Amino acid sequence: MLNTMFPTINRESSMLGFGCMRFPTTPDCKIDESEAIRMIRHAIDNGVRYIDTAYPYHGGESEVVVGKALKDGYREKVILTTKLPVWLVKTHEDMMKFLDEQLKKLDTPYVDFYILHAMNNERMDAMQKLDYKRFYAEAIAQGKVRYPGFSFHDDAKAFLRILHDWDQWGMCQVQMNILDDENQATLEGIREAGRRGVGVVVMEPLRGGLLANPPVDVKAVYDAYAVQRSPVEWGFRYLYAMPEVITILSGMSTWAQVTDNLRIFDMAKRPTLTDEELALYQKVKATYLARTKTRCTGCKYCQPCPMGVQIPRIFQGYDAAMLRADSSFKAGYAQIQADHADASQCIHCRKCERACPQHLPITRFLEEIHAASTAE
């Protein structure tokens, strides 16, 4: 296993981290507890030193199962991270209330990282008003939390705002993969975190599995390259070549995924990507993106629409279906129609187009996607 170090806090981790939001489930959709525990412990026995969970994962049951998995001496072997559900926090006191509830679920007196979950500009406003820094000082003084951090879903400007708001962040958790190097935190945001000594933990390294099972045209790009690796290996290699990345989370849901990831990371060394490899990644990205229509980043500057059209939901859902080369969006669009948020509500005011930082022809895209999604 490739071992790593969080720079400012001088804490050892592993390049592979176990994300606990996609555990195996039983036919009645409950966590297969015995299998999940077996998977976590096998990963730890083979060098994984970072475990990531959160308050809402698996309907609130992920933390309970993680707590059970970390019995019998396993807790002391890992960095344990869970997250404050900031969207549920209404008062300063709520922060400690949620932390105490989560510690009870995890059956541990402390967590290593307690991070603000899914932060964006709006949530940062709320956390500042509720004095999140004072909460962390209290939780750390009481021995319940070792280090603060945040996970993130917004644009690059918002990321830098949150990153620069405090010099005590121990880590940041961001979405990054071959397709998202210019989305959300962006590569430059990751580099700025590195310059500030804030360790980067990557989520969605394979875009929810999308990059693990590429369509035929993307697979052909990989197959034409001189060195043969699986798409999963290529996806992880892109990330662990980044010196700022300390841990890459994988939401493993099967024993096979655990063993395959352990195999990949057992062989991993931080490479310096060659010009040929960088060109390969650019070609893979371009081939994926050529399948999409809108390339909407989900920034939501177009929202709210005066007619209630959920533009990012439509655009990102459609593009995702095109990336997967399937027809699943039709069912999703039917639900958007049922919500009265589909493109037929558009009155062509073009308020959205004036607000779009990508200068997308939103009205035209809405018409074309509506036609494609409602055709017999």
Protein language model features and the residues they cover:
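N-terminal binding-site loop/beta-alpha segment at the start of enzyme catalytic domains
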Residues: 1-78, 135, 141
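Conserved, mostly hydrophobic/aromatic
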Residues: 6, 18, 36, 43, ...
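Structural motif
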Residues: 42, 46, 105-106, 143, ...
